[in-house]
Amino acid sequence: MEAPERAGGGEPPEPGGRPVLGPRAFVPQKEIVYNKLLPYAERLDAESDLQLAQIKSNLGRAVQLQELWPGGLFWTRKLSTYIRLYGRKFSKEDHVLFIKLLYELVSIPKLEISMMQGFARLLINLLKKKELLSRDDLELPWRPLYDLVERILYSKTEHLRLNSFPNSIENVLKTLVKSCRPYFPADSTAEMLEEWRPLMCPFDVTMQKAISYFEIFLPTSLPPELHHKGFKLWFDELIGLWVSVQNLPQWEGQLVNLFARLATDNIGYIDWDPYVPKIFTRILRSLNLPVGSSQVLVPRFLTNAYDIGHAVIWITAMMGGPSKLVQKHLAGLFNSITSFYHPSNNGRWLNKLMKLLQRLPNSVVRRLHRERFKKPSWLTPVPESHKLTDEDVTDFVQCIIQPVLLAMFSKTGSLEAAQALQNLALMRPELVIPPVLERTYPALETLTEPHQLTATLNCVIGVARSLVSGSKWFPEGPTHMLPLLMRALPGVDPNDFSKCMITFQFIGTFSTLVPLVDCSSVLQERNDLTEIEKELCSATAEFEDFVLQFMDRCFGLIESSTLEQTREETETEKMTHLESLVELGLSSTFSTILTQCSKDIFMVALQKVFNFSVSHIFETRVAGRMVADMCRAAVKCCPEESLKLFVPHCYGVITQLTMNDDVLNEEELDKELLWNLQLLSEITRVDGKKLLLYREQLVKILQRTLHLTCKQGYTLSCNLLHHLLRSTTLIYPTEYCSVPGGFNKPPSEYFPVKDWGKPGDLWNLGIQWHVPSSEEVSFAFYLLDSFLQPELIKLQCCGDGELEMSRDDILQSLTIVHSCLIGSGNLLPPLKGEAVTNLVPSMVSLEETKLYTGLEHDLSRENYREVIASVIRKLLSHILDNSEDDTKSLFLIIKIIGDLLHFQGSHKHEFDSRWKSFNLVKKSMENRLHGKKQHIRALLIDRVMLQHELRTLTVEGCEYKKIHQDMIRDLLRLSTSSYSQVRNKAQQTFFAALGAYNFCCRDIIPLVLEFLRPDRKDVTQQQFKGALYCLLGNHSGVCLANLHDWDCIVQTWPALVSSGLSQAMSLEKPSIVRLFDDLAEKIHRQYETIGLDFTIPKSCAAIAELLQQSKNPSISQTLLSPEKIKEGQKRQQDKNADALRNYECLVNTLLDGVEQRNLPWKFEHIGIGLLSLLLRDDRVLPLRAIRFFVENLNHDAIVVRKMAISAVAGILKQLKRTHKKLTINPYEISGCPKPTKILAGDRPDNHWLHYDSKNIPRTKKEWESSCFVEKTHWGYYNWPKNMVVYAGVEEQPKLGRSREDMIEAEQIIYDRFSDPKFVEQLITFLSLEDRKGRDKFSPRRFCLFKGIFRNFDDAFLPVLKPHLERLVADSHESTQRCVAEIIAGLIRGSKHWTFEKVEKLWELLCPLLRTALSNMTVETYNDWGTCIATSCESRDPRKLHWLFELLLESPLSGEGGSFVDACRLYVLQGGLAQQEWRVPELLHRLLKYLEPKLTQVYKNVRERIGSVLTYIFMIDVSLPNTAPTTSPCIPEFTARVLEKLKPLTDVDEEIQNHVMEENGIGEEDERTQGIKLLKTILKWLMASAGRSFSTAVKEQLQLLPLFFKIAPVENDNSYDELKRDAKLCLSLMSQGLLYPQQVPLILQVLSQTARSSSWHARYTVLTYLQTMVFYNLFIFLNNEDAVKDIRWLIICLLEDEQLEVREMAATTLSGLLQCNFLTMDSAMQIHFEQLCKTKLPKKRKRDPGSVGDTIPSAELVKRHAGVLGLGACVLSSPYDVPTWMPQLLMNLSAHLNDPQPIEMTVKKTLSNFRRTHHDNWQEHKQQFTDDQLLVLTDLLVSPCYYA
């Protein structure tokens, strides 16, 4: 609903105050509707207009005056608050201006990160409701966002710690892009493709980056007429890529996310049908389910599975439409995985399956909502042809309901199932609710399985609303309600906590939905009722009975939970956690029931609870609280009737018991007195107006009991006072009934049954508000004057030292003061007083916004808040000076100070938890299908109340006044006092206060740091610790030690370091050491780079000016004069200069601190750590710090050395001179025209990038005329529009400079590294071991050396050379690692050296590397691998030809044994793999070299060769739009291999275990050669199973028969490597993804092998088949011939002569039936039954001595096949009994007396049937006839088991 237009008066504006509105006010974009329902709604328009006008004016001014901080941030925060309070209550024009301004601000390039994040979050919020602004209203460019993401997420300097970003930044940026995406211009898709396509090189990490960018940036919600500029430009290309990749590289998942979004935004505009089988196959594969008889999962599958959420969105968006294909596949998917949902299954895959169940219905409901109920907006609607039809919905619900019902009892709990059922019931209650109820009724009866009860109730709660409202589809729903309620009552059980809680929730949910009114009388009066209504009417007669029984149950619960054992007096104020939960459950359920009762039932219940409470005396801790809660609930519902009963009774008892004055001084009071006080204090928490009748009695009681000596007594009396004040002064709704106006109308007018499950009507909520009347307010003041005033006078005197008070008296007085304060928080105006000025300079106003919260404060009266403040402060200093150990009083004082500062009627933490529980209840009962806020009335009222509380709590960003300052200083004093508990409580309040007042931290920091000053002698250890805690902050609030502000950290960081010299500091105390550790850790974790440049570009200022000029609403403020703007710019320049000054000052002060003589080492380390945070990418570190870090490279402590290494690497990056680049035209260089369409891979126009040993630059001239391209991915997919390479040597920064040519910073480094002593020491340190056996190649040290050689070229080589030569020859682990790090740095650092220098370098390096590579050991070969890989990464291979030629010399020379050979290959592989597609020549050379060596003897070399082959063939991918590779190709290689394996393939016998491994002398026969070759080939196939992007299936198929022959059947470790590998390899190959065209090929191989003479091969075909079919389920299902072939294959193998093969065929059959790949049709059944009837030959009389035939007769085999087939059918439904099952079991049982192995098979089948059906036998029994049951019972417990 749009708001009615507002009338704007034309009165003259008051200067500066009221907002000016034009003659017709604006139309708000979207308000928060709940504001309209507040009792003071009429005042809000004026209030919000004023605020909006102020925000527009001041935000605009701040930006124009270049004041990002404090002005800009202050007013953007105000805008966030405004949105939280009023929604998007501004005109469309303002909305667009706000967005544009923030977009400009976010994209300021040098903006400080924390500001950027703040602006981004607000911008996300402004863009959140995209239906409010169409593409016509708003257009946002995409490039600024791309620059932002590139700069931050792909930062080039973050890894060197020159930038610190917060962890949250990634999500914020991605959400920001997502929010702006709908508004990108139409041409942006083409621009993005042009920008990121060149990155798409599948072997490179850039692929991941390209696809990530596509996923988050590509716009998919363009209108249909622009589709040709949108997804049509990339859809075929990317889906082609997705369909053809294998093995889930990480980016495949991101493609899925992109397609899911595309599908959702364009339902009906894309034909997905061709891809559906592939999509479902992949989704099924990505669930990683364990399948088949040999379960080896490819390890890579586990890490990169699809995100289920996106897969679900994709499926949902493709549903519907004419073809219904998706629904068919979805049904297939659930059929195939249903059995995994059975509660007896558990595994790491279960979570995914549950998430699938939970998300799918939710997603379908959202789609239905969008298609049928959502208000149309500018977003493309779904075309009629593709909307989901009713039939679609029914099919969907039917296919998912089975798994959901199974999941109800899952091991992980019933939560997901309940959420799924809730959504399914919205769509098809008639299909969903009956089966749930079927499971619920028995669960309510069972005593032995409480978890069933919990699970079913949870699910019924989910469907409650659909059940009760009884739609036309499921009219009988409501009739179940009463039986369910009555049966749930026994669940209120004192002995079972969780059962109790779920029952409360269950009863509470149903009573909220249904008026508990007895309508049975209507039957006589009306005759127009339907049958169901009649049934309901007569049932409602039971309501009264239900309520009374429920109360009896609760009374039982209460009596059993009485506090029998006396707990220790001190801490028993608290209930145990469980007790308090039960208390909460009980009281909220009871109050719901009474709210929903008719007057008649209520009166009965009231009488009952009254009688119960007055006839017992309860202890006040547990039982008393519960009873009092029940009474309070009753009184709240009908205050008049209830107070009449309770108040006189309690008043009587209390007056009676306190007649005698002795009572006042008793330490222990009478139980009855305490109980009545407790009862009275609870029942006064009701509508204040109703209490006024009893004020005399209540005041009398307060006078009698407030000053009791007994603490328990006066505390209860204070509660009474507190509740009286609250009830009379707060604003709150007085009833939460589900129908406005309640149910007390005669049945002739009102028929409650019609209101079952009815939602509240937001526009006719009819909230009954309690707004304090003048009478109530004066009563509240009367209470304060009578009870608060005297206490304040006493405490005032005590604080002045004029009156001695005992501690107990002080405590009592404080308790009364505190109760009054929190009772009247709403009544007392906030603290006044002058503000603390001069904390921050600002040119815009930073004024507070005042919100009206329903009460006009009476300012003529004395403000008790201020009186309390002054009295308490005086008292506090008195106590701290005289009796600091009176901790109880101090605790209360801390509470009082906190409430004085913040409490205006509600507490933040209570509000937060209520907001949370509101959201939970909303979720559990919402109707997502219809949307439109159709919540039940109570929930809507609650939401309005929360809106009111939100307003009372919006005090953050308050003005910081003197009085606040005083109180915060008091808190600081308490936070550093002697008692740890006092400190702890005070610190929590202190942190809350710091967060509430603007800029107060700057005022407080110096005071905290006072305690850390090293020159103070009077600081105690407690004060020191307290101060440190104050700096540390709590986990949520401010951390003073690390405010993102130069002015603050310039004080705190140096103070932390110097505090190490304070005499209060003691490193012996572990608590202090831990504090410093925590502080350092927190600073490092939370530090974000602080800005040095706060300039605002012109583009922002222009929009800011528009914002200030925007009318409706606006305040009359003059526009800024040019002088003002100049002044703003001047100030901003000063601020930049200030920041820089502060930065340098901080570095220097920290250095001073660290260099103090006797500073303990811990503080030195902390200081150096802080210094290292100050490295930046926009300023070089000051010289003194550079000198410091370089010196510390040789510090004694390894921690310091590590920090110094990082820092110096960063400094070298800062000092890096920029290298000039120029644009080239790759087509000119190659002399080829530009290709017309995209073709990736090896093309003529990128051939010049390849390594070609004929054209390698070997002379200076060739070198300088070559065009080098360093990054490996350029040119593979296509060329970028603007291809940039480094310019020639003469244009680059000068090399070989003398010391004089360098800047001072460089000289510092130059001097140290030219000094042989320094270098020697450095190398000694670097070659020490750090953590034994766990050290790895260190990227930090590599960066250090790379920087040294990049910035100073070969200046230091002479000094280093002797060290390198020495280190290389030393085979110790740490020395080898050190030299590997230096060499990698050298090779990478020499990227820009001149040819002469490079040539000299390789003359030095080649001999070094040869030595190193022959000295590798087990510990170091990894490091050399990393070294070479790092050296080659992103480098042009032509520049490294020395290295590659060296590596290829002869890797398998045999020098140093097989181990060194394997290592050399490993290192070579590392280098070549980094070069990807650019070194085909080298790959061919390597393959040629390796091929004759494939028959290697040594296992480690074979494994390594296998892995190297994977990398050699990695480039041979079959991706779409990709040219055939010039690198080695798999088919040619496989052909050559098969030729050599002929001797093995031709032979038909088994290949035996071959152990004749080592060195057979002389020529081996071909066969032995073949076996060795095969071992290597197996290693290759296993290595590539998880790595390559596409499997060359055709080639592998030719090897399959051979593997089938070798693979063993049993798992036996005595087999040799060959057999084990063959088995593993088959398992991995069977999990591979197949393309449709490969299916016939593979089936041909399988059926050929199934005729093999080796039964091992036949057996293995079956295990292979199981896995292959499941992992490619829909690809096979999509091909009818394939299904037929497989079925035929299995049926043939069922009749195999080998018993094991027959049994495995049966297992396979049952598995394929179970996942619904095959169906049990009559043809199959008849076939098996025929086989079973095969006549067996007569038994011959055997001679006693002769052995029976070992070969079974053909007849026996046939008959066995039939029995196995039937058995497979039985076992294929392990969890239910289909209609055909009983007869099959009967047929089977006929064979129990057949000869073996038939008898055994039948027994096994029966015992399995019994095992799987035992759990739900009661249910399954129904499927059998009585005769069948008799036979079955006989069989299942037949004596033959025991015979």
Curated annotation (Swiss-Prot):
Broadly expressed. Present in heart (at protein level). One of its GO terms (biological process) is DNA repair. It is found in: Cytoplasm, Cytosol; Nucleus; Nucleus speckle. The keyword Cell membrane does not apply. GO terms for molecular function: lysine-acetylated histone binding; peptidase activator activity; proteasome binding. Phosphorylated. HEAT repeats lie at residues 475-519, 998-1037, 1179-1217, 1354-1392, 1636-1674, 1680-1718. The modification Phosphoserine is found at residues 1121, 1614, 1746. SUPFAM superfamilies: ARM repeat (SSF48371). Keywords: Cytoplasm, Developmental protein, Differentiation, DNA damage, DNA repair, Nucleus, Phosphoprotein, Proteasome, Repeat, Spermatogenesis. InterPro entries: ARM-like, ARM-type_fold, Blm10_mid, HEAT_PSME4, PSME4, PSME4_C. Disruption phenotype: Mice are viable and show no obvious developmental abnormalities. They have reduced male fertility due to defects in spermatogenesis in meiotic spermatocytes and during the maturation of postmeiotic haploid spermatids. Testes are defective in core histone replacement. Pfam families: HEAT_PSME4 (PF23096), HEAT_PSME4_mid (PF16507), PSME4_C (PF11919). Residues 1-23 are annotated as: Disordered. Belongs to the BLM10 family. The bromodomain-like (BRDL) region specifically recognizes and binds acetylated histones. Homodimer. Interacts with the 20S and 26S proteasomes. Component of the spermatoproteasome, a form of the proteasome specifically found in testis. This is Proteasome activator complex subunit 4. It comes from Mus musculus.
